[in-house]
């Protein structure tokens, strides 16, 4: 019986939301910027997945690296 209770306590529900972040430095920095910002408002982040990468160009120069990401976080009780 105690084992069934343990399994029930381990059940979790997660939510996924999309964000877009940018950086003038690199794609890696854009991911860090996105994670830092998401961490300010979302609790229980368990993972992120980069869905898309884009580069903004102006006057024949790269001005921003952009990433679209899924943020996975646990839903609180």
Language model region names:
Residues 2-77:
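N-terminal, polar/charged subdomain of small-to-medium soluble alpha/beta proteins
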């Amino acid at each position: 019986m105690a084992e069934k209770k343990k399994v029930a306590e381990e059940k979790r529900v997660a939510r996924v939301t999309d964000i877009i972040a940018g950086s003038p430095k690199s794609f890696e920095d854009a991911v860090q910027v996105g994670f830092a910002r998401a961490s300010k408002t979302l609790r229980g982040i368990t993972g992120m997945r980069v869905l898309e990468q884009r580069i903004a160009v102006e006057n024949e120069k790269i001005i921003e690296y952009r990433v679209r990401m899924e943020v996975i976080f646990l839903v609180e009780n």
